[in-house]
């Protein structure tokens, strides 16, 4: 029974596609975002890197959870005139879209 908890027997953290910002479309179809769950170890590292600043921490967790679009891509950051995935999220999303991303990230980490 204990073997079910071994690393090699555990399922990978969840990844899911979801609707975050319907205004981003290609060929008339909404571009879905792909987000992933993060480990508690990664979460703790993000907390340290954030300087224990709650606002920065939140943005960093969201950015770390986004698989697609590639928030680290220089071309996407350049198109919004920002540097850094966290800054990109704050610039490219409306307040409601940002809230939708927060909800999706929370759900994928349950």
Report residues per predicted region.
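A short linear-motif detector with a strong N-terminal bias
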Residues: 11-14, 44-46
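Short, intrinsically disordered low-complexity segments
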Residues: 10-13, 22, 35, 55
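Short acidic-hydrophobic surface loop/beta-edge motif
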Residues: 14-28
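Low-complexity intrinsically disordered segments
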Residues: 1-13
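Generic alpha-helical secondary structure signal
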Residues: 9-10, 17, 84, 102
């Amino acid at each position: 029974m204990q073997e079910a908890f071994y690393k090699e027997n555990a399922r990978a953290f969840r990844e899911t596609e979801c609707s975050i910002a319907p205004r981003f479309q290609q060929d008339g179809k909404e571009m879905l975002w792909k987000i992933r769950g993060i480990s508690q170890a990664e979460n703790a590292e993000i907390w340290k890197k954030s300087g224990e600043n709650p606002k920065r921490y939140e943005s960093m967790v969201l950015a770390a959870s986004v698989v697609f679009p590639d928030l680290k891509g220089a071309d996407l950051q350049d198109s919004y005139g920002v540097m850094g995935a966290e800054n990109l999220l704050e610039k490219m999303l409306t307040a409601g879209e940002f809230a939708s991303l927060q909800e999706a990230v929370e759900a994928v980490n349950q």
